[in-house]
Curated annotation (Swiss-Prot):
Region (Disordered): 1-110
The family this protein is said to belong to: Belongs to the UTP25 family.
Gene name per UniProt: utp25
Organism: Aspergillus fumigatus (strain ATCC MYA-4609 / CBS 101355 / FGSC A1100 / Af293) (Neosartorya fumigata)
Protein name as annotated: U3 small nucleolar RNA-associated protein 25
PANTHER family given in the database record: ORF PROTEIN-RELATED, U3 SMALL NUCLEOLAR RNA-ASSOCIATED PROTEIN 25 HOMOLOG
Length: 671
């Protein structure tokens, strides 16, 4: 790869600009990019791509769809992924094509006001407020059962107002190419989407915590319209300016219309099948005449649902149905008539990946191969089903988001005279839009709102008003549901406080009932549900070594248990050989077992997913003959003030405040 030639091109192209622009960030960036310009390998065939203002280099890591291929694919395979000589190129004359480039530029278009026509003085003030965490808020509960919190950087300008609902695309500044497909597919924006769409299309950050299986498809389509609209407008602007530069070569033009690298949209998704659904939505609205590598994409990403899962919950089938592999990455490139799958990242417009799949190429063992420059110019981030990503490995999500919009280490064929000023000033993270959808909001997901959502245009958080999972228990008889609050000074001390309360208060009475019972059949059947794996290990070790539990037979299964081990433990528990069964939330998330033999339930902590409450409590009714006795055994759950978010989902929005603040007692019972 001829890095020196590219660097010479970049530096020579930017000499004239440097004489005119002496901004410190620009000079520092040029100095930074002069480092490490030695060739790292043999020169390869390169092709002209009139998109980012110059010649673009090949990207070393493959953006392929196969986990095995990702590890084995060499330079030749990467070269083969490049467009063939016959493939349609990006030429300036495309600006006169059918991409809707005849659309008149509208000064009121959010694309213009957010990315191009920015008042730099106002932008600087808003960035300063965002950096100092000075936000002005407005809250509102709307009739559809949603709570909205909107925040904007506090620069002393008026009050914060909520945007009116959007019911049609008529008020959205869409490319003409998109208007027909969008209005045909979505004639009316309804449900939660009508309240969220105004913020999406006005380029504000969105944290949506009410994702369901019934509304996920509509939200996915709206996000696809937004993503494709952004790609087309970005691409059209660049091609128009390319044409203008070619026609006015003697003019001193200052056309800043792009970032450092080509990728503009990043999707983070939990599974390959989720990627297929997102791509299908994108294709539905872009409507390409040709789709290159589509068969390869479907063969490696899509699969049929498992017919044996017909009795599994609907949300489980949505998440794990089809191809549930969580190791993937995919680049999509758009030309006038074609959409190409498996394009190299530096030649892609949209990148879709799982957190694990993306991190494997960003954080390689060989330091020289580590690369995240392709994320330097991402302007739209879509994180779908964030709660599912939380159950995978949230550290990967944080790793990726921490490396978004950093200034690149290499030039990658960038024409710096075309780069927007706020990129050069290292302010891209304040202009980037982030949209996160989740079935529920946890502290980890909530931290995205405060840490990574720094949009100068503002941000909005949308959460449901919860009735409470305790009121939707699927049992034919009422069951006693008791919540015990324990004191915990800080989140870091919470695990120790919880363990102490469990072993001294809950376990002592539990052991006494088990060991003193004359009827062995009634002595067993205690399920201990533990949300955290670390807590699970601690409790399991205590049961195995403590003198307190010497006479208590128990089984313990987690997401790391082997299938044979899980089958044996479940059988022993059902038959009464194990009086106690320890069971983790992540195991339930991945398996959704129906545990038989449950007569009483102890929740070491309430589940993050409110659906799990009804499913776990429902175990009490799996044996119709003993359902009345099981209902008497009931449920006991431990909580502290640090469990506020998930406790609200279990007991309901109206009840949670009193339970956290009540000074008259620490035990609450619902029947």
């Amino acid at each position: 790869m001829d890095h020196e030639t590219q660097m010479d091109d970049v530096l020579s192209d930017s000499d004239d600009d440097e004489d005119q622009q002496t901004a410190r960030p620009y000079n520092e960036l040029i100095q930074l990019l002069q480092v490490n310009t030695e060739p790292k390998g043999p020169a390869r065939k390169r092709r002209k791509v009139e998109y980012n203002g110059g010649e673009k280099r090949d990207f070393v890591p493959a953006a392929n769809g196969e986990e095995v291929d990702a590890a084995l694919q060499g330079d030749d395979d990467l070269q083969e992924q490049e467009p063939s000589d016959e493939e349609e190129e990006d030429h300036p004359e495309e600006a006169d094509g059918n991409h809707g480039s005849d659309d008149e530029e509208d000064a009121n278009d959010p694309f213009e006001t957010h990315f191009s026509a920015i008042d730099e003085n106002k932008l600087a003030l808003k960035i300063k407020s965002a950096e100092e965490k000075k936000w002005k808020n407005a809250k509102k509960e709307i009739s559809s059962g949603l709570k909205l919190v909107r925040a904007i950087p506090d620069v002393g300008e008026g009050d914060v107002s909520l945007l009116p609902a959007m019911k049609h695309f008529s008020s959205v500044k869409l490319k003409k190419k998109l208007c027909g497909p969008a209005t045909e597919r979505i004639p009316e924006i309804s449900g939660d989407a009508q309240h969220i769409a105004p913020y999406i299309f006005n380029y504000q950050d969105v944290l949506y915590g009410a994702r369901t299986t019934s509304n996920s498809s509509a939200m996915r389509d709206i996000l696809a319209v937004h993503a494709v609209n952004h790609i087309l407008k970005t691409r059209d602007r660049v091609l128009k300016n390319n044409s203008r530069i070619a026609k006015e070569q003697d003019a001193d033009l200052d056309l800043r219309d792009q970032g450092f690298t080509r990728p503009k949209v990043l999707y983070l998704l939990p599974t390959r099948q989720a990627c297929v659904r997102a791509v299908e939505s994108i294709t539905r609205f872009f409507q390409p005449e040709q789709q290159e590598n589509k068969k390869r994409f479907l063969d490696s990403f899509s699969a049929a649902d498992d017919k044996s899962w017909e009795n599994k919950p609907e949300d489980f089938r949505e998440l794990f149905g089809g191809n549930d592999d969580d190791m993937f990455r995919l680049g999509l490139k758009f030309t006038r008539k074609t959409m190409k799958y498996f394009s190299q990242f530096y030649n892609s417009d949209i990148i879709l990946a799982s957190p694990l799949g993306l991190r494997t190429i960003m954080d390689q063992a060989d330091v020289k191969k580590r690369d995240h420059d392709f994320l330097s110019s991402v302007e739209l981030v879509i994180v779908d089903h964030a709660d599912a990503l939380l159950m995978q490995n949230w550290d990967h999500v944080g790793y990726i988001l921490d490396r978004l919009n950093l200034q690149p280490k290499e030039a990658h064929g960038c024409d710096f005279s075309r780069v927007r000023t706020w990129y050069l000033d290292n302010h891209a993270r304040f202009v980037r839009q982030m949209i996160v959808s989740a079935s529920f909001i946890t502290p980890e997901i909530n931290s995205l709102f405060s840490t990574h959502m720094q949009n100068f245009a503002g941000k909005v958080k949308v959460t449901p008003v919860y009735v409470g999972a305790i009121s939707e228990v699927p049992l034919p008889v009422s069951v006693k549901q008791t919540f015990s609050r324990f004191d915990s000074l800080t989140p870091t001390k919470d695990p120790d406080a919880r363990f102490k309360h469990f072993t001294t208060t809950v376990l002592s009475s539990l052991v006494r009932n088990i060991t003193s019972s004359r009827d062995k059949s009634s002595a067993g059947g205690t399920l201990i549900f533990i949300p955290s794996y670390l807590d699970f290990v601690r409790v399991r070790n205590y049961f195995a070594t403590s003198s307190q539990t010497t006479n208590v037979s128990f089984g313990a299964i987690s997401e790391y248990s082997e299938v044979r081990e899980m089958t044996r433990a479940r059988t022993h528990f059902m038959n009464g050989r194990h009086a106690v069964l320890l069971y983790t939330e992540r195991l339930h998330h991945f398996r959704r077992y129906q545990l038989r033999g449950v007569k009483r339930i102890v929740m070491y902590g309430v589940p993050e997913n409110p659906l799990f409450w009804g499913e776990i409590v429902g175990f009490l009714g799996l044996d119709p003959a003993g359902v009345v006795d099981a209902a008497e055994g009931g449920v006991r759950a431990l909580f502290s003030k640090w469990d506020a978010l998930k406790l609200e989902r279990i007991v309901g929005t109206k009840r949670v405040g009193n339970m956290l603040r009540e000074k008259g007692g620490d035990t609450f019972t619902f029947v």
